[in-house]
């Protein structure tokens, strides 16, 4: 890579979205149970800088708002920085996905980054992107942070694929730093001595799930049984609030490939999967989402239209 190319700045792309929904008047505290929204969720704020945009909102199931994120160049290279901020206000319901995989290409000495901040405040958020594909020589930092409160409902996933195994394009060089976090704001309460009425004293942001994956093309973890066990695709699905019964239900879906396990961590369902290719992980996660959605979100699953194209 020559000096001129190395000094050429990459894309600095930013996308900020905010969704708003009408809150039922009888729920003054914003505690909106599944199926109790009033009115259509609207995308009230849409700010973008650089080649990171959204298509117009879709409403295939009535009030919930379906939005598709699009990165026009079709890939991320060295020096590119992508940032996505999503805020879903009380009473709103947003489903966000992408029309295709996000491709991270060779960086030639400059890392690329993707930061995603997802916030649901008394709202419902479904984060269902296609996979990230990391090609040979990619040097990537990704961070997805989910912020929810006790009144929020969330289902989302992140899937990564090391190269394109089906085309014999392998991730045999490069550096990956992949972070996935879920934080929950908890209200410390006490009781007023005279009335024993709980009073909110303070709100604390508590980390419920923190995952750090560090890999290089030559990493021993790629083939070790304590690591990826030779698999090329890895994914994590999170859903909250969740119960032991939902964990048992999802466990019924785990048969053979992909290698997967499901657990419950402080009210968050965690489903993790490994497979030779991303398609197997994606199929499992879609099946899990279809099974979880009626109980977590309160609606039957409606596949985003873009998945059928």
Label every PLM stretch briefly.
Residues 12-16, 64, 81-83, 113-115, ...:
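Broad gene-expression machinery/nucleic-acid interaction feature
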Residues 107-172, 180-181:
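Internal, conserved structured core segments that host functional sites
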Residues 16-18, 68, 85-87, 117-119, ...:
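Residue-level recognition of well-ordered beta-strand positions that form the cores
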Residues 31-34, 187-203:
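Intrinsic disorder/low-complexity segments
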Residues 93-95, 124-126, 153-155, 235-236, ...:
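Structural motif
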Residues 160-190, 202-309:
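A structural signal for small-residue-enriched, beta-sheet-centric alpha/beta enzyme cores
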Residues 41, 198, 205-207:
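Tryptophan-centered short beta-strand motifs
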Residues 1-131, 136:
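N-terminal, charged/glycine-rich beta-strand/loop interface patches
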């Amino acid at each position: 890579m020559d000096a001129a190319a190395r000094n050429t700045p990459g894309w600095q792309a930013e996308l900020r979205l905010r969704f708003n929904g009408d809150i039922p008047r009888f729920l003054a505290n914003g505690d909106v149970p599944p199926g109790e929204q009033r009115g259509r969720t609207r995308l009230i704020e849409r700010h973008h800088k650089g080649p990171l945009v959204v298509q117009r909102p879709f409403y295939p199931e009535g009030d919930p708002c379906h939005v598709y994120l699009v990165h026009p160049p079709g890939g991320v290279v060295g020096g590119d920085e992508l940032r996505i901020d999503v805020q879903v206000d009380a009473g709103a319901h947003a489903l966000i996905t992408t029309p295709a995989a996000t491709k991270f290409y060779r960086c030639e000495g400059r890392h690329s980054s993707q930061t995603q901040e997802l916030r649901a405040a008394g709202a419902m958020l479904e984060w269902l992107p296609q996979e990230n594909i990391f090609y040979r020589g990619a040097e990537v930092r990704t961070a997805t942070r989910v912020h929810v409160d006790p009144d929020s409902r969330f289902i989302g996933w992140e899937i990564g694929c090391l190269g394109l195994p089906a085309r014999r394009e392998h991730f045999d060089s490069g550096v990956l730093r992949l972070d996935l976090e879920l934080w929950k704001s908890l209200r410390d309460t006490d009781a007023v001595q005279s009335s024993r009425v709980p009073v909110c004293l303070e709100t604390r942001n508590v980390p419920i799930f923190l995952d750090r994956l560090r890999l290089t093309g030559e990493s021993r973890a790629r083939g070790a049984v304590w690591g990826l066990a030779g698999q090329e695709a890895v994914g994590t699905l999170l859903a909250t609030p969740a119960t032991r019964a939902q964990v048992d239900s999802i466990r019924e879906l785990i048969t053979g490939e992909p290698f997967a396990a499901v657990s419950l961590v402080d009210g968050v369902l965690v489903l993790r999967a490994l497979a030779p290719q991303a398609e197997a992980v994606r199929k499992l996660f879609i099946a899990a989402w279809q099974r979880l959605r009626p109980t977590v979100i309160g609606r039957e699953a409606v596949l985003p239209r873009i998945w059928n194209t």
